[in-house]
Amino acid sequence: MAPLTLSVDVKSSSATSHDVSKRVMQSSQLKINKGFFASVNTQEDKPFDFFRTLFEGFIAGGTAGVVVETALYPIDTIKTRLQAARGGGKIVLKGLYSGLAGNIAGVLPASALFVGVYEPTKQKLLKTFPDHLSAVAHLTAGAIGGLAASLIRVPTEVVKQRMQTGQFTSAPSAVRMIASKEGFRGLYAGYRSFLLRDLPFDAIQFCIYEQLCLGYKKAARRELSDPENALIGAFAGALTGAVTTPLDVIKTRLMVQGSAKQYQGIVDCVQTIVREEGAPALLKGIGPRVLWIGIGGSIFFGVLESTKRTLAQRRPNTVKETKEE
């Protein structure tokens, strides 16, 4: 009886081992890519998850908005007075917190609504678009969030800027007088110019912030710290603020003109400013605006991410992800 022999196909075994190793590496890489570029839960959507994201967005957005507005209101007041001044008018530095309380009453729900709409919209779009189009998802979500928040932002902005320029002494009296003299539409003065400024601003700022965060996470292979989020937020805010300054000047002029109707619309406003004051007038207040929005972006995104993380840690049955070694 011939002895039993065991034949091993070394080439086949090596190939099989190589295939297994390759599949493991591909699986790991897929997880990393999904983590860095999607930043969303890949599990099947549930109604509760949607409403939880919505609720957490409301809380985080409202908190961040109130903190930023309170801290930077004086700079915003100076910026508004610079932009509203015609020719070489002097800027009054008194009453820099004029209208803050009334403005907070509008900023809180507006910021809550913006982030509450932005977060679930972003997550839905990131699941729809491929990874290399994540910027489109962030741009679109930012614009949609800004559109929703504009319903609250515009009346708040009108009242705030009328008070900052000394037309009224209190928010309630401002609302009553504007409504009585200009009608309900007076509270939405400059609405189109507001959208012209804020929709691009929201879309660009959040897109820059999100894309920089994703790139940093990919390079560092870890989550960002609060100071890192704040630094990226400052850069995104300052850059976006500088680019959109002409739009902000136009919006401010249309909102503070009241019933005098010095400008008949966006085009007339631009033409009048350039004709009477020169093109550089469209950049009025760019220094305070960049400073205000840069610092504001730092505070806003720092507080926003910190609040979101705190809320996520308080979720029931939260599964903590292991950090990459």
From Swiss-Prot:
Give me the Solcar repeat coordinates as residue ranges.
52-124, 133-215, 228-310
Residue stretches spanning the membrane: 55-75, 97-117, 132-152, 230-250, 285-305
Q: Where does the protein end up?
A: Mitochondrion membrane; Plastid, Chloroplast membrane
Effect of a null allele:
Severely growth-retarded phenotype and reduced chlorophyll and plastoquinone contents. Unable to germinate when homozygous.
Alphabetized PROSITE patterns for the sequence:
SOLCAR
- Where in the body, by tissue, does this protein show up? Expressed in seedlings, cotyledons, leaves and flowers. Lower levels of expression in stems and roots. Not detected in senescent leaves, petals and pollen grains.
Top-level taxon of the source organism: Eukaryota
* Statement: the UniProt record of this protein carries the keyword Plastid: yes
One Gene Ontology cellular component annotation held by this UniProt entry: mitochondrial membrane
Homology family: Belongs to the mitochondrial carrier (TC 2.A.29) family.
Per the entry, what this protein does is:
Transporter involved in exchange reactions through membranes. Has a low uniporter activity. Specifically mediates the transport of S-adenosylmethionine (SAM) and its closest analogs. Probably involved in the uptake of SAM in exchange for S-adenosylhomocysteine (SAHC), which is produced from SAM in the mitochondrial matrix and plastidial stroma by methyltransferase activities.
Protein name per Swiss-Prot or TrEMBL: S-adenosylmethionine carrier 1, chloroplastic/mitochondrial
Organism, as annotated = Arabidopsis thaliana (Mouse-ear cress)
Q: What gene, per UniProt, encodes this protein?
A: SAMC1
